[in-house]
Amino acid sequence: MSSIEEVHYKLRQDSPLYYDVYYSTGGVSNIGGGSDVWVRHWIEEIAPKLNKPFYLLIDRNRLETDKDVGIQAIYRNHPDFHTILDNTEKIHILHGYYEPTKIILDNADKIETNIMHCTLYKSLRAHHDLGLSWLKHFKSDFSWESKMLDVAKKTIWIGLSDTDYHKDYDIIDIPNFYEFKGDSKAVESNTVGFCSRMETRKAPHFLEDIPSYFFTRVDHFQEWRKKLNLKFNKSKLYQYRWEKLKKFLQRDDWGISHSAHIYEPFGYSIFQAVDYGKIPIISEDWLHEIEYPFRASTKEKFEECWKQICELDTNQRQGYIDYLRDKLNRYTNKKEWVDKYLEIYNS
């Protein structure tokens, strides 16, 4: 018996009679976006405290680049993947696909909870709202979003503001959290940093005429240039790698963050900017209750905000950063976040 066969045999022998399934599409070792960060937090903070036997199923094939992260993950190309699904009574979706998925359709009656990470009804119209002729978005089906709201016994929203669905569904609000770990010391540079995926609602085209650094996927950057005839002549491109994110954030040659992403559910890039001393330009639709002058939802307004920030000295920038950090401290309680989920998962 090969070593792989031995692992599979042991899994079958050790399988509990009753168990929950936690289902995800990513977040194990390859971190690409906010939903992956959420799943990683679940793995590190919630999974060890669950009081019921469970399996973590990842609905994609395991790659050679995938690494173990302290918890056993069963990938789609594992021979027991479908058997585990068939024999469970409860499925908790940590992060699912944004279009109809056979596995979910076949097990719809078992969906206990579903984590809602974004609002498709908004993000799929982002190109219209930004005046663009092209939409860059991950594969998705608008109708699937409402279908999942109907199917899941409990829907949990990770964002900071209510969605339109809150009017018709009993949605549980558990906002994400962020732990400030940097010194938030203002950086004087006027170069703008963009640390995000280049989907349309992130509005990367705002930086067309501004000195800037992109920390993102090279192929997506090139796609934007080709589809919308953008030059980005004043921009430098750095290939995104999760393990290099902190180093990029710590650089002192960019001091302003392009965080003006419309329809932002939580806003990791805003928290990161504040954490590492980059004064952020944020969208006009994010946390209205915070009074902040540097908000933009158009390219022209973004350029205006950038010019205004360029006129600020370091002390003035520090004042805005300290102000935002104080306002955002309400979303830094990791224990509260963990406890709210455990109350649901362990009930």
Predicted segments, located by residue:
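Short N-terminal targeting/anchoring amphipathic segment
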Residues: 17, 69-103, 113-116, 254-257
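Conserved donor-binding/catalytic core segment of Leloir-type glycosyltransferases
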Residues: 19, 183-202, 208-213
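A charged, aromatic-enriched C-terminal amphipathic alpha-helix characteristic of glycosyltransferases
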Residues: 37, 297-303, 311-347
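Membrane-proximal helix-turn-helix segments that form the acceptor-binding/catalytic region
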Residues: 115, 119-157, 250
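Short beta-strand->alpha-helix junction loop in the catalytic core
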Residues: 122-123, 161-164, 172-184, 219-221, ...
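Conserved active-site histidine-acidic residue motif and adjacent donor-binding/catalytic loop
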Residues: 218, 227-250
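Nucleotide-sugar-dependent
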Residues: 256-270, 283-292
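Short hydrophobic beta-strand element within catalytic cores of glycosyltransferases
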Residues: 275-283
